[in-house]
Amino acid sequence: MARVTVQGAVEKIGNRFDLILTAARRARQLQLHIREPLVPEDNDKPTVIALREIEKGLINNEIMNAQERYDALEKENSELHAVSLLSNQ
């Protein structure tokens, strides 16, 4: 089990409050298996994995926002495709 210090993660995000929000959001993604971890899991809990990813600069709010926008566009495109298939019948 890896130890994580929040100081490195705070430096990447800017302040402790934003770090808490970012880490919680990322941990939720990991816990619900919405996204795969970007660092080895090493039997760690999602909160620790999220902090390690933030500390390494792999995750921040901008990255997560971009991923969510991409997912929303993909979902919208697949729904439009399904509707077009149904309307062609």
Curated annotation (Swiss-Prot):
MF terms in GO: DNA binding; DNA-directed RNA polymerase activity
Keywords: DNA-directed RNA polymerase, Nucleotidyltransferase, Transcription, Transferase
Biological-process GO terms, alphabetical: DNA-templated transcription
Transferase recorded as keyword: yes
InterPro entries: DNA-dir_RNA_pol_omega, Pol_omega/Rpo6/RPB6, RPB6/omega-like_sf
Source species, domain of life: Bacteria
Entry GO CC: DNA-directed RNA polymerase complex
Residues in the signal sequence: none
EC number(s) from the headed UniProt entry: 2.7.7.6
Pfam families (alphabetical): RNA_pol_Rpb6
SUPFAM superfamilies linked: RPB6/omega subunit-like (SSF63562)
Catalytic activity reported: RNA(n) + a ribonucleoside 5'-triphosphate = RNA(n+1) + diphosphate
The keyword Transferase is annotated on this UniProt entry: yes
PANTHER family reported for this sequence: DNA-DIRECTED RNA POLYMERASE SUBUNIT OMEGA
Similarity comment: Belongs to the RNA polymerase subunit omega family.
Oligomeric form and interacting partners: The RNAP catalytic core consists of 2 alpha, 1 beta, 1 beta' and 1 omega subunit. When a sigma factor is associated with the core the holoenzyme is formed, which can initiate transcription.
The protein's role, per its UniProt record: Promotes RNA polymerase assembly. Latches the N- and C-terminal regions of the beta' subunit thereby facilitating its interaction with the beta and alpha subunits.
Protein name as catalogued: DNA-directed RNA polymerase subunit omega
